[in-house]
A protein has these predicted regions:
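N-terminal leader/linker segments that initiate helical-solenoid repeat arrays
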Residues: 7-81
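Canonical positions in the second alpha-helix
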Residues: 49-50, 86-87, 120-121, 155, ...
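Structural signature of tandem alpha-helical TPR/SEL1-like repeats
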Residues: 36-48, 72-86, 107-120, 142-150, ...
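Residue at a conserved register position within TPR or TPR-like alpha-solenoid repeats
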Residues: 68, 105, 139, 169-170, ...
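TPR alpha-solenoid repeat register
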Residues: 60, 97, 131, 162-166, ...
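Structural marker of alpha-solenoid helical repeat scaffolds
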Residues: 53, 90, 124-125, 158-159, ...
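Extracellular and organelle-lumenal recognition/adhesion modules and their flexible linkers in secreted
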Residues: 9-23, 27-28, 32-36, 161, ...
Length: 492
């Protein structure tokens, strides 16, 4: 059917209708744009205008609810909750709306409803680590630790960069290490290693508690040292404190670290139970903390578990109870734990040598380039021992063109006995082999060591003390092989 508009009246009506429709559409578009602009402004006045123009606008109700809930000058929790409840009914799948409602309910003391709203976030979100983190913290403030830790577990799975923050937050909220380990920390190699590292480092201890313990132990009335972090406070005490204050600080740190290391050992066992390969170097802070917390035998047990798993090579045991790890340098030293620690220093080149050796496949070569009068102590190993015990040390050394007034030698000392000679600054209690000088063939050097009543950790160090004349540099090469420490005399 064809509609004919021949009369001027009909044409006018159509024109008016079309114009009105266009004007209405233009108005609605403009109004919506204005509403959007008002919402973005997020002031109370602009949000009121937005709702006046568009009643029931979810975004406006949400932002106005936030305003009444958290802007102190306009605080009205009841009104804020009403608006946020309307917003979640309007947008029931928006996690941010539920999180805001949970926060305002928690602020007003309605904990059951706040918990239910926070749990809505966890039900809706699977990958948004930011919202899961906020929801978990909200549950934490309400004392819902298991539920909060479950959310932190999911946060770590989706965003590993949250690991240190999660660990720190959990330990500030509770001392229940089992709850943290089993609810917050994913049972994976990376998570367990990161948590092990966190527990092992003194830098992650409660700084305020440490400062308080230090103040009590010193009995000092002076103000506690202030700093932004552990390292700053520790450095301040060491630079300005008396020997007694420094000792008290070390004692406070050691005491605070003990319960953390109890938990770290549980993490270690769980990590090994996974049966997966990992880089042992990532666990070295754990071993170092065990040693420095005066738990050397536990370090041995943890090390032996790595060996049993095949992650580390088995000890070269020429004697049935040889305590030196990798004494023949057959495996590459890994610079940590109970293995050799070889640190770089200018003017010295430390390498493995397959040509010069006593037995096995190689030895350790140390070449001094003659650049300076060097204080060399850059090859060492921590060795857990027993108090009041006789040990027999031996090592083979060789040298070529080693010119110096002060030659290299092995020095063994009690890690905890730091008493020093006032004149030389050297340790009062240590055992030293004869110095190596000039050209020598492989020669066996031996020591008999009687540990004291408190000695449980020795340091075996390749040492060269500076010559008294400053211009007497050291030049030449020495080799080391077949280093041993045992309670049985070496008769070979």
């Amino acid at each position: 059917m064809t509609l004919s508009l021949r009369s001027s009246g009909a044409k006018l009506m159509v024109t008016v209708f079309a114009f009105g429709a266009c004007a209405y559409v233009t108005y609605r578009i403009g109004a919506q744009a204005y509403v959007g602009w008002c919402i973005k402004q997020s002031t109370k006045t602009s949000l009121d205008r937005a709702l006046a123009l568009d009643p029931g606008n979810c975004g406006a109700e949400y932002r106005l609810g936030l305003h009444y809930s958290f802007v102190l000058t306009d605080l009205d929790l009841k009104r804020g909750q009403e608006l946020l409840r309307t917003a979640v009914r309007c947008q029931p799948l928006d996690s941010q709306y539920w999180l805001a409602l949970a926060a305002t309910l928690e602020a007003s003391g309605d904990l059951p409803e706040a918990k239910a709203a926070a749990q809505k976030v966890s039900a809706l979100e699977s990958h948004n680590s930011v919202l899961l983190w906020r929801s978990g913290n909200l549950l934490l403030r309400m004392g819902q630790l298991p539920e909060a830790f479950d959310l932190f577990h999911r946060v770590i799975e989706g965003a590993p960069e949250y690991l240190p923050l999660v660990f720190s937050t959990c330990w500030k909220s509770t001392g229940d290490g089992d709850l943290i380990l089993h609810r917050a920390v994913p049972d994976t190699v990376d998570s367990d290693l990161a948590y092990l590292d966190f527990l092992s480092l003194a830098q992650n201890l409660d700084l305020n508690a440490l400062q308080t313990a230090w103040g009590r132990s010193t009995g000092s009335e002076q103000e506690e040292p202030t700093g932004k972090n552990f390292d700053q406070v520790s450095a301040l005490i060491r630079s300005k404190g008396t020997p007694e204050e420094i000792h008290a600080w070390d004692k406070s740190v050691k005491a605070a670290l003990q319960p953390r290391l109890d938990e770290a050992e549980k993490v270690w066992d769980r990590l090994l139970a996974l049966g997966e390969e990992f880089d042992p170097k990532k666990s070295f802070n754990f071993f170092q903390s065990l040693l420095e917390a005066d738990r050397p035998q536990e370090a041995v047990k943890a090390w032996d578990k790595l060996v049993a798993r095949g992650i580390l090579p088995r000890r070269e045991q020429h004697l049935s109870n040889d305590l030196i790890v990798n004494g023949g340098f057959e495996a590459e030293p890994i610079n940590g734990g109970l293995d050799w620690r070889i640190y770089p220093v200018g003017g010295v080149l430390v390498t493995n040598d397959r040509e010069n050796r006593v037995e096995g496949g190689r030895s350790l070569s140390v070449h001094f380039e003659g650049l300076r009068n060097l204080d060399f102590k850059h090859v060492s190993q921590f060795v857990p021992v027993k108090p009041n015990t006789v040990y027999y040390f031996s090592a083979f050394l060789k040298s070529r063109a080693l010119s110096t007034l002060s030659g290299p030698h092995f020095e063994i000392y009690d890690y905890w006995d730091d008493r020093r000679d006032e004149r030389t600054g050297e340790r009062k209690v240590s055992w030293k082999t004869a110095e190596v000088l000039g050209d020598t063939e492989w020669t066996k050097y031996q020591l008999t060591i009687h540990t004291g009543p408190k000695t449980d950790l020795l340091v075996v160090s390749l040492r060269r003390q500076p010559a008294l004349e400053l211009d007497k540099r050291i030049q030449g090469t020495m080799w080391v092989d077949d280093v041993r420490l045992s309670t049985i005399p070496d008769t070979e």
